[in-house]
């Protein structure tokens, strides 16, 4: 089957490579000509503009857009100008699901089909496959099924759930038609919100282990210094990288994310290579917003999002104000840096 790919960054290029490895025909375009040439050398058909790109696709044409979120809307609009009724535009980035609903309606007026695909797998997707969460018209999604099946990890990527019998479902192969337009990115949005929460849990737990020797610190015990009492119970020099390593094997909290965490700690045990300013790409905010709209408690996901804000210095004014208030009502003086 043929697919056109617009955007040849790490994920876009690896999607193309995975498709070509399975015998699919790929037409590619990127604003960076070198990215196009690289995939041409691997067997793709290159193009030098969106018009050239569209002209090299067989009808009904399917064009997958995989560009940074800020550019997605503009690129889809420009690609739509080159497409004809019956053609399909796929958004495989991290777009807001509400934009998908509006975009699908706009494209439908032009006779174009729209499919939103939440794509998870990152830089490891070529080897591991990409988990796909899909939104769109049922018949259009079914038409694209051979592409999704190739891109997805496959049923062998995880042990089968106990008591499931019969032929493996698409979900067991790593891709799922979640519903109409917007459903794919809605599910991916919540996936990323959960990711924030899991990451925060690992970070907080391992930080508690990292501070388990706080009782060895010399100093006067007061309400300003931890531990407040019984320092003899906090004398442990825990090897945090090795804890992450042992948890990978047979523990309840084992996961691929923990595998990556263990690798990061092995490379930089004290994490001195990082400043700790944690970005958020939007999905966490959208997830919390959806929880508010639905009236659904999302305490962990909300806290994980707000911690990312704090890591970037967004709480500095509030923290200073807390110190100022303590000084006002109790005469408390701030301790110097490095005091805990």
Task: Give names to the regions the model predicted.
Residues 51, 63-79, 96-99:
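Beta-loop-alpha module in the N-terminal Rossmann-like domain of NAD(P)-dependent dehydrogenases
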Residues 65-67, 92, 150:
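Short, well-ordered coil/turn residues at beta-beta hairpins
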Residues 85-88, 92-141:
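Rossmann-fold NAD(P)-binding glycine/threonine-rich loop
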Residues 26, 46, 89, 114-115, ...:
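Hydrophobic beta-strand scaffold residues
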